[in-house]
A protein has these predicted regions:
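Short gly/ser-rich loop at a beta-strand->alpha-helix junction or flexible surface loop bordering the NTP-binding
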Residues: 1-60, 180
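Hydrophobic alpha-helical interaction segments
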Residues: 66-195
C-alpha cells in the first residue's frame, strides 16, 4: 500500500504479483515494483515497518498490462496475469527464478486466467524473443495446452542460444528446437508438480 507514494508510475509486479494471483506458494519478503521512473536506489527498506521494496526500472515499451485492485480500501496498480507471467520469463531473477516462472505459467494457463494468444501479444510487445524460447520449452515439458501459438513462438525465436535459467551456471545440453542452453534439469523444473 506504500508503493503509490514511493514512485509514479508504478505497478506491483514479478514475484509479488505471482503471489497475489496465487501462482506461487512462496511468500516474497520483498515487494517488487515495476516503474519507468529512474531512481537513485533500486532497493528501499523501511526498517520501522519491516518492509523492503525492490524497484525494477523498465523501458516505457515494457510498462503495460496493468490493472487496478483494491486492498484494504486502497487502490493498487498491479500487472495483470498475462503480464505477470511474461515479466517473470523476461527477468526470472525478480520472481524467484525459472521454477517460479514455470509455476506461474502452469497455473495461469490451467486455470484459464490467460490465453495463449494474449501471451504471444505481450511477448511481442516486450521485444525479448528469448521469452518465447523459455516459455515454449516449458510448455512442452509440462504438456500445457497452447494450441497453434506454440508454432508461432517457434517462428519468432531470436538468433543464437539463450539460457533457460539466467540465474544458473552456463552449462548443460543445448536444445536446438528452442535454441536454449538447458542449464536446469527437467526434474528440477517439474519437481513441484509431483508434491
Amino acid at each position: 500500500r506504500i508503493a503509490p507514494y514511493l514512485t509514479e508510475p508504478h505497478a506491483i509486479a514479478y514475484w509479488s504479483a505471482l503471489h497475489h494471483y496465487g501462482y506461487t506458494e512462496q511468500i516474497p519478503t520483498t515487494t517488487f515494483v515495476a516503474t519507468t521512473a529512474q531512481r537513485g536506489s533500486t532497493v528501499l527498506e523501511i526498517e520501522e515497518l519491516g518492509l523492503t521494496y525492490r524497484f525494477v526500472v523498465l523501458a516505457a515499451r515494457k510498462f503495460f498490462g496493468l490493472r487496478s485492485i483494491w486492498i484494504e480500501g486502497e487502490e493498487i496498480t498491479i500487472t495483470d496475469q498475462a503480464k505477470t507471467v511474461v515479466d517473470c520469463f523476461d527477468r526470472p531473477e525478480y520472481c524467484g527464478g525459472i521454477v517460479e516462472a514455470a509455476k506461474g505459467l502452469h497455473e495461469a494457463l490451467t486455470e484459464g486466467h490467460v490465453s495463449p494468444p494474449q501471451l504471444t501479444e505481450y511477448v511481442t510487445r516486450m521485444g525479448n524473443r528469448t521469452i518465447f524460447k523459455r516459455m515454449g520449452y516449458l510448455v512442452e515439458l509440462m504438456a500445457l495446452p497452447v494450441g497453434q501459438e506454440l508454432q508461432r513462438w517457434r517462428q519468432d525465436l531470436s538468433a543464437g542460444y539463450g539460457l533457460l535459467d539466467p540465474l544458473a551456471s552456463d552449462d548443460g545440453p543445448y536444445d536446438s528446437r528452442w535454441q536454449l542452453r538447458l542449464n536446469r534439469s527437467p526434474a528440477d523444473l517439474k519437481d513441484w508438480m509431483v508434491h
